[in-house]
Amino acid sequence: MKQSIQRLSALLLALALTLSLTLSVSAAETTSVLEATAEKAASAVMSYGQAAQVSWAVWQDGKIISSGSQRPEIDSTGAHLEGQGDIYGIGSVSKIFTTVAVMQLVEQGKLDLDKPVVQYLPAFKMADSRYKDITVRMLLNHSSGLMGSSFGSALLLGDASQQATEELLARLSTQRLKADPGAYSVYCNDGFTLAQLVVEAVSETGFMDYLRKHVFEPAGLKETWSPASSFELRRAPIYQAGVVEDPLPKECLGVVGAGGLYATAEDLAAFGGALTDDTLLKASSRKAMAAPEYANGLWPQEDFPDSLGYGLGWDHVEWYPFAQNGITALVKGGDTGYYHAGLVVLPERKMAAAVLSTGGASTYNEMAASQLLIAALREQNVEVAEIRFKLPAAKKAALPAELLDSAGYYGSQVMLKVELAEDGTLTMSYLDLPDLPARKFYYHDDGTFRDEGGSSALRMVKESNGQTYLYQWTFTSLSGLGNLPGSNYAAVKLPENSVDPSIQAKWEEQMSFLPMNERYSSQSYLLLGTALKELAEAEEATENAPGYIGNLRIDSETHASYTAQIPGTAGRDGYDVDLRRDDKGALWMECSNGTLGMDLAAVPELSTGKDNAAACTIQPNGYARWYKVGDKAAGKTLSVQVPKDAGFWAYDAAGNVVGSSLLWKDAPVELPEDGLIVFAGNPGAKFQLTFQ
């Protein structure tokens, strides 16, 4: 299965724009140290992550002490900069808002963190009896055992539909769990969408109405919004390089509680500040959120710090380098297709910093926010030492014979092939990233495999659950952003799975599945072009582990299942896959997270109709209508009359987007030879087509 619709979620392109930059800094009370640090950190975010625009804010003791932006120069008037600053999507930092709402209901005695979710959501059911053991706490600490992200029609453009949230319970009803509830914490978006539904059920209030009354207003947040809010003149623009020069429509995530909120850097920093006192939560609730929940389940037992360590909602409750200096630091990052956010809170110091960007990565933003806080503390004569961790001294050694059995295939978000030689050389290849060169590590007498520079190391660990994990240690230094330590399980060894070679071959046939049940406004259609390009440019098939297709275990000719159990993030977003053929022989792929795809080979040819006029009607099942551009239509100019809540996308043979009602409204499209066109909308929606 060379390509599948699931790969689209990984095709979130970094924006590399060559634009003139202006630096805007405003501060009530600031000094050159903090300003210089902010400018340097923002530049680093733009450099390392290719971010197009960055904004930041630092809050202390009830007020913003510094804020600013590095942004493209739009025009000389700066009209779009009215108010506090530009508004960005904050992605998964929204999870902290959801967590606060849950904890408020706990304080009111309306919720119990350790009661089953089904007690509050009787409609919540799954095709796995263990779902009854999932508690509210497990939703907030990522240990529910849910597969991960049921994000069909969740990542949208210019469309604030909440379809993904509304359909979550139906999607979960056919899913199984990937782990026992509470076994370990692994990043899980669906848990927070469920938590949003719990808040609505218990409070008997719409989620956004609840947040406005009980979170935004008490915290004084006037620049925090849902995707349905109107703030277009203030929204930080987003782009899709190589597709369209103009800014894209507003990015809308239909899972607000998991990642859909928008805010300014100032508002987000102020929200973090509100979590340093009793403004939103009692001290006991804030303490509960900051507890090391990750330690309740499977987790590497190492002395080195990592970039993850879940609390309730928080990504890390012992964030480097503050924890190593006796300072409590809480962090949450957020990444959407186009926006990235980092929030760091120092509750004991009554400080918080937020860094938001278009393009880039939340990790860089979190590191930048840390640098701002370090600089602010330095101005107050509080030094935070950025301790450089090193591996303990060890010498190269011959490989113990018993470790040779650790060679094999390891699964995570990427597939790894680990080869071991008797001289102690470990060669690690990235199977689904064949362009990346293999890495070599060398065995040392302390049991680690280290690279030549000593900047990273691996070790095989046999855990209490009987599985063998590939533990990784890293320590990275980035100018302007500080250091980033890593100490986590990167992958798990895949058990042997013997299947008939003919079945393996069928799964490995080059197939490209087209999205069939995504909304017309889905980012999948925009990003599909990249997947089609990859398919066209691929010279050879990706290697798979015997008995596996990617990280899925082949169970039969038509079913493959997700089996990796890894804490942290390496084991996130699993799904099972079923293949079937319809009565016309077309091959379909059904993923357990609700995604549905049809093989490109089954797409019919577009008809120009009678007298160069035709119609296309969406099927009763709501599935999209795909067509190939054949000889009859190639070269003609197509005009489309688009019905309400519907749209079309057109691609050339190389996968480039050449037409879109979402991007270019009713502009006619010159149909390219061997191209594709898709029409999507509600059941019965009728498109009128005119060819010239």
What are the functions of these language-model segments?
Residues 1-12:
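Bacterial N-terminal signal peptides that target proteins for export
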Residues 12-22:
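Bacterial N-terminal signal peptides
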Residues 21-29:
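Sec-dependent signal peptide cleavage junction
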Residues 29-67, 212, 252-692:
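Catalytic loop of the DD-peptidase/beta-lactamase superfamily, centered on the K-T-G motif
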Residues 33, 37-41, 92, 97-101, ...:
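Extracytoplasmic/secreted proteins, especially bacterial periplasmic and envelope-associated proteins
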Residues 43-81, 113, 156-158, 162, ...:
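A short, well-structured edge-of-sheet supersecondary motif
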Residues 47-55, 77-139, 178-190, 256-259:
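Short active-site loop at a secondary-structure junction
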Residues 74, 129-337, 341-342:
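Short, surface-exposed loop or secondary-structure junction motifs
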